[in-house]
Curated annotation (Swiss-Prot):
GO cellular component term of the entry, any: chloroplast
Source organism per UniProt: Calycanthus floridus var. glaucus (Eastern sweetshrub)
GO molecular function, one term: structural constituent of ribosome
Superkingdom, taxonomy of origin: Eukaryota
Gene3D superfamilies, alphabetized: 2.30.30.30, Nucleic acid-binding proteins, Ribosomal protein L2, domain 3
UniProt protein name: Large ribosomal subunit protein uL2c
Disulfide-linked positions: none
Length: 273
């Protein structure tokens, strides 16, 4: 969708750039309320994820990541905004009466027909196993475990590429640049996720960020020593360390957070950039 620029009428709209007007009228049987009281705290009330809290109430849309309506054609009825993700979603009416939401593929319009299964056409929005796809196919919503549903390449504008097939595995290049092996029996959706211009959005004011449930970020160098390792000193002082650290004293800015010796390390041929 196109990016809408506000006319310069107030300071808060001077730098604003939002998505085009996409309405949201979700079906009642495909939504449910979420519990939003954690605010980044654990069961003991201790902050485990900083800078979270507040935000507008949301209703969660049930998204069909499995695409298990096999060999039944479906028609795109609506393209809707989803507050829980930066990609748009489509309401699909299947031939057997089933109604489900899926991620909106780039270029799909209302009235298009999609289908999932084996030996289906290689066209935008169709879901099929990797073994039935030709090399070079652009895909999204990729399964890691057979039957669990898509887990990779689901964000707005995300697209992966099928670059090789050998034995029981297929080699994919993911949006992060990582190259990894996945079972050829796992399914994926053809095409790219829509709303590719999401990175051109500009919230324009602090209140828009608060609507998203994100609180202000305070630099550690302006805190007291009791609050952050970078804090303290007279006036504008350096951090006093060789390298930046987190509030808990661990190395920051570049420290790898992936668990060591994870079982899936053998499937990763090249780490992400």
């Amino acid at each position: 969708m196109a990016i809408h620029l506000y006319k310069t009428s107030t300071p808060s709209t001077r730098n604003g750039a939002v998505d085009g007007q996409v309405k949201s009228n979700p079906r009642n049987n495909l939504i449910y309320g979420q519990h939003h009281c954690s605010k980044g705290r654990n069961a003991r009330g201790i902050i485990t994820a900083r800078h979270r809290g507040g935000g507008h109430k949301r209703l969660y849309r049930k998204i069909d990541f499995r695409r298990n309506e096999k060999d039944i054609s479906g028609r795109i009825v609506t393209i809707e905004y989803d507050p829980n993700r930066n990609a748009y979603i489509c309401l699909i009416h299947y031939g057997d009466g089933e109604k489900r939401y899926i991620l909106h593929p780039r270029g799909a319009i209302i009235g298009d027909t999609i289908v999932s299964g084996t030996e289906v056409p290689i066209s935008m929005g169709n879901a099929l196993p990797l073994t039935d796809m030709p090399l070079g196919t652009a895909i999204h919503n990729i399964e890691i475990t057979l039957g669990k549903g898509g887990q990779l390449a689901r964000a707005a504008g995300a697209v992966a590429k099928l670059i090789a097939k050998e034995g029981k595995s297929a080699t994919l290049r993911l949006p992060s640049g990582e190259v990894r092996l996945i079972s050829k029996n796992c399914s994926a959706t053809v095409g790219q996720v829509g709303n590719v211009g999401v990175n051109q959005k500009s919230l324009g004011r602090a209140g828009s960020k608060r609507w998203l449930g994100k609180r202000p970020v305070v630099r550690g160098v302006v805190m007291n020593p009791v609050d952050h390792p970078h804090g303290g000193g007279e006036g504008r002082a350096p951090i006093g360390r060789k390298k930046p650290t987190t509030p808990w004293g661990y190395p920051a800015l570049g420290r790898r957070s992936r668990k060591r010796n994870k079982y899936s390390d053998s499937f990763i041929l090249r780490r992400r950039k």
